[in-house]
A protein has these predicted regions:
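N-terminal leader/targeting segments and the first structural element of proteins
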Residues: 1-86
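Aromatic-enriched hydrophobic runs in primary sequence
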Residues: 15, 45-46, 79, 112-114, ...
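Charge-rich, low-complexity amphipathic helices
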Residues: 45, 49, 53, 93, ...
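Compact, basic/aliphatic-enriched, mixed alpha/beta core segments that act as assembly/interaction modules
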Residues: 61-124
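Intrinsically disordered, low-complexity terminal tails
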Residues: 121-139
Length: 139
């Protein structure tokens, strides 16, 4: 007899990984739209929390030392050279008045929040949960 109770089947499609990839696509598209505008529309602003030690994160060593696990940046009024690609985004932000270039892979992002519309996303903290080879459909 087959066990058809919830959770008894093996997920060969990997829906959880597909969902994580789709949610990262929402983040990517939101950032890409703002980078094309070269300014934040309306009252929108973003809080982006990311894992500072994850492979591919590029930022000043003193910031990694100050934030050894996670860091939250605010993208609102003062940012420069904001560029978004398929797998990461780059931005210049000022820390204590000094411009700092940052490159952050989407896989390193753990939380995204736009308080102007009370919209937020939380991603798996385990990067291995992100699907490798799962195609991401971009507009």
């Amino acid at each position: 007899m087959l066990d058809r109770s919830p959770g008894s089947a093996t997920d060969h499609i990997n829906y959880h990984a597909l969902t994580q990839a789709a949610l990262r696509g929402v983040l990517r598209t939101a950032l890409k739209n703002v980078s094309k505008l070269e300014r934040m529309p309306g009252d929108h602003h973003f809080y982006v929390t990311f894992r500072t030690r994850m492979q591919g994160v590029q930022m000043a060593d003193y910031l990694k030392d100050k934030f050894p696990d996670e860091m939250t940046i605010v993208i609102q009024h003062q940012y420069w050279e904001f560029e978004v690609s398929d797998d990461h985004f780059e931005i210049i932000l000022k820390f204590s008045g000094v411009p700092q270039h940052m490159s952050i892979p989407f896989a390193a992002v753990s939380r995204f929040f736009d308080p102007s519309v009370n919209f937020g996303l939380q991603f798996d903290s385990d990067p291995s949960a992100i699907a490798e080879g799962v195609p991401t459909v971009l507009p």
